Amino acid sequence: MAPNHAGKRFSKPHLNDELSNLVFNANPASGPWQEYNFAPESRTQFPQEIFATEGNVQKASSVLGGRRGDMTLSGKDALITFDFYVNTCGMITLEFGELSASGQQVSIAFSESKAFVGRGSDRSMDFHVEDGALSVGVDGQGTRTCPDAQQRGAFRYMTLYMETSGTVEVCSVKTYNNMMPSMGDDLRQYPGFFFGDDEFLNTIWYAGAYTLQLATIPTGTGRRSDWVHKKVGWANDVPAALDGTLEVLTDGARRDRTVWSGDRALSTLTNYIALNNKISTKNGVDWMFKYQTDEGVFPYACPPIWHYGSDSYHLWTYVSLYNAYFFDGGDDAKDWVRQKWPAVKRGMDYALQKIDDTGLLKVTMPLDWGRHPLKGHNLEVQGILYFSLQKCAELAADVMGDEILAKKWSTLATSVKNVSWELP
């Protein structure tokens, strides 16, 4: 069971020889820093506490912590909300006992926050779709596991309630946490670690690492686009990376489950430091390059959302490429970049043709993250262009041996920077 961090006070280290010994003899998988680790000890996770009940619910605590019990729910107003103590994910399994009447119907709703606990799940499909609840038919004794498509990307609270007037007996409740399959069964064995005398900072670091674990999803569990999905429900059963790959780092576990170049440009560094997960990072970059258009445009959001129209995210793709190369290193990483080089140049040519007589890129694809559409000679875009030109010049020289192109892009980067400082 992962620790319950809510309201917990951690012991502070002594900044003396004892701490020095901890650091210099450190093993990332063992040490006092593991007290802050949110990752579970097992992929099979169980509810740990009752958050709320309504109506006729008996022996609710009998199924907590992995115990096999005999909880009953009777009547349409019967409801129970379980607290797993930490964000988890995956496929819920319920075992119904012999006291369960035939022809009954129960529903399951999920929430990451207690603010959204109820008979409907928090939104994972975007603004146009209500997730609602997962309906489960009960015909007496037996075990039910949610369909693969209805696996939940992230939740802490699970609400189970009756839709019919009879009784069901629940003997066990569990979820199989399928995040980051490359880690096997021990999800706490981080290659990296962090430890200091600030409890809050330690907690933030491990919360960030665990967030990336959750967001590293099995390849075939991307979220269906809400553009084509029905208006109620959710579905996490479509590819989010190339066939034959195991997993991919996405922008979020519950909601998008999709590769966005801008998001991963920021998460890649944390991913390498904490988890050293080269494959999930490179798989995401491969997915971006697969969906480059003939014109050279990279996606704003990769499939399954699959949307274009962003100059900033087009350029963020280069940041993602460079970060994956830089943190991987070695001849394999160079070969990986070489395979993409024609696409790198095609995409850069597309961006550079938007530089007008001001010497700056004029935005024509306005989409960006969480803000009004970009326009004109936006400074953010110039900054990303400058960085992309710098790093692609480095790749041109160090990987491709093309000093002429490296000089061209480096000179242009300097020009963009200088002109940007002159913006009114």
Residue ranges with predicted function:
Residues M1-A6, E403-K407:
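Polar low-complexity intrinsically disordered regions
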Residues A2-L249, P303, K334, Q339:
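Extracellular/oxidizing-compartment recognition motifs
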Residues V129-E169, D197-W205, L212-L214, P218-T221, ...:
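Aromatic-rich carbohydrate-recognition surfaces in CAZymes
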Residues I108-A109, V173, N283-V285, G401, ...:
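Composition- and surface-driven signal marking solvent-exposed, interaction-prone regions
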Residues K375-P424:
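Active-site neighborhood of glycoside hydrolase catalytic domains
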Residues G118, C146, H372-P373, I404:
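A generic structural signal for short coil/turn motifs at secondary-structure boundaries
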